[in-house]
Amino acid sequence: MVSRGTRIGWSLLCAFLCLGVACAHNGPEHQIEALSERLIREGASADVLLERAIEYRVLGKLKEAARDLQRAVRLAPSDSLVLLELAQIELQRRRGPEALLWVRQALQIPGLDTGERAAILMIRSHCRAAEGSKLEALEDCSEALKWNPQLISAYLERSAWQQRLQRPRERILGLEEGIRRTGAGLLVAERIEALLDDAQWQQALDAIEPELTSSRLQGTWKIRRARALKGLSRRTEADRDLQSALEEIELRMPREVKDSSLLMDRAFARELLGQTEAAIQDYKLAARCGGGEEAIEAGRRLRRTRSGRPLWPWRT
C-alpha cells in the first residue's frame, strides 16, 4: 500500500508538471477547460478538483479554487493534501479562522505520517501569525520540528519568530541544532545573522571568514563581515568591505527587471555606510520588486532614524 505521504509527493509533482505543461502550451485557462470536461465526463473526484483548484490559484481566482477544494473535501474528508491546499487558499483570501478550521480537521486524520503532521503544523503556524498570535506561531514551528527534524523551512521560520520575540540565545541554539541535524547552508547563514543581531561580533566574524573564502559571490558575505567589523570598531575595514560589496552588486544587478534580494543587499550596504536617502530609495524599490514586508519595514525603520539617532548599537 502506498503511504499517504508518498501519494502527496506524487500528487504535488503531478500538479506542478501539469502546471508546467499548461503554461508551456495553452495556459491555465485551457487546462481548466480540459479538467471541467473531465469532471463532466467522469464525475467529480477529489484529485481532479484539486488539480483544477491549483489552476484557478495560478490565475488568482481564489474564490473558485476554494469552491473546488470544498467539494473535494466533501468527497475525501481525510485527504490531508486537499485540506492543506484549502487552508493555504483561505489564508491567501485573508480568512484565517476558516483556514484554521481546515488545519484542525487535517490534524485529526488518523495515520498521518511525520512529514504530513509537520507540514500541517507549519500551516497552523501561518494561521497563528495571521491572527497575530506570535508565541503560538513559534510553538507550532518547534512542534513541527519534533515530527520532522529535517524541515529546513521550519528552522528558518522559528528563527524569525525568535528574533521578533527577542529570544536571541534560544534562536542561536535552535539554529545550531538545525545545522547539526541537516547541515544546511541556509541555516549556517541564518546563525551568523543571529550572532550579528545579538552583537556577538567576534563569534560572527570567525564564522563568516570560512564562508567568505569558499563563496564565489562574496557581496552578501562582505556586508555581513562589515557589520561584524563595525561592531568591533574596525570601521575602515568595514567600509572597504561595503564598497567592494556595492561594486559586485552593481555588476550583478539586471538592467531592466531589478532583483529584490540584490536591492536589499545594496540598501543595507548603503545604510551601513550612512547613505540614508539612497538606502531608503533602494528599500522602496525592493518592496515594489517583491521584497515584501521585510523591505517595507526596513524602509520605515530607516525613515524613523532620520532625526540622527543611532541606527545600530555600534554607531555613535
Regions found by a protein language model. Give the residues of each.
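Start-of-helix register in tetratricopeptide repeats
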Residues: 47, 81, 115, 119, ...
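Canonical tetratricopeptide repeat
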Residues: 51, 85, 116-119, 123, ...
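Short coil turns that delineate tetratricopeptide repeat
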Residues: 43-44, 77, 111, 115, ...
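Residue-level recognition of tetratricopeptide repeat
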Residues: 54, 88, 126, 160, ...
